[in-house]
């Protein structure tokens, strides 16, 4: 349904928004605080994706794809999340104009 599609795209875009500011040499650091109060500063997308407690199935699947990319090549976790988010953003625009999701 249209509502389910919107929720899935929104979850993917939320993950994209979290990682967007990490990309590149001027990327910002994120502070992770564990349940025990330990603090970790990082801008490594792979570390962030491993440490985040992602609940939504679509966002979790995207995180798994990105971390698999990083495990294989040693890089690219953040870029993968950003590209997937942009592809879904564009797909959402086409769908809102009446294009059927199967065509995309």
From Swiss-Prot:
Residues binding Mg(2+): 75
Cystines in this chain: none
Subcellular localization, as worded in the UniProt entry: Cytoplasm
UniProt keywords, alphabetically: ATP-binding, Chaperone, Cytoplasm, Hydrolase, Magnesium, Metal-binding, Nucleotide-binding
Catalytic reaction(s) noted: ATP + H2O = ADP + phosphate + H(+)
Binding site for ADP: 24, 76, 78-79
Assigned EC number: 3.6.1.-
InterPro entries with a match to the protein in the record: Chaperone_TCP-1, Chaperonin_TCP-1_CS, Cpn60/GroEL/TCP-1, GROEL-like_equatorial_sf
Cellular component terms per the entry's GO annotation: chaperonin-containing T-complex
Binding site for ATP: 24, 76, 78
Database matches in SUPFAM superfamilies: GroEL equatorial domain-like
Quaternary structure, from the entry: Component of the chaperonin-containing T-complex (TRiC), a hexadecamer composed of two identical back-to-back stacked rings enclosing a protein folding chamber. Each ring is made up of eight different subunits: TCP1/CCT1, CCT2, CCT3, CCT4, CCT5, CCT6A/CCT6, CCT7, CCT8. Interacts with PACRG.
Function: Component of the chaperonin-containing T-complex (TRiC), a molecular chaperone complex that assists the folding of actin, tubulin and other proteins upon ATP hydrolysis. The TRiC complex mediates the folding of WRAP53/TCAB1, thereby regulating telomere maintenance.
Family listed: Belongs to the TCP-1 chaperonin family.
Protein name: T-complex protein 1 subunit zeta
Protein's organism: Sus scrofa (Pig)
Gene from which this protein is expressed: CCT6
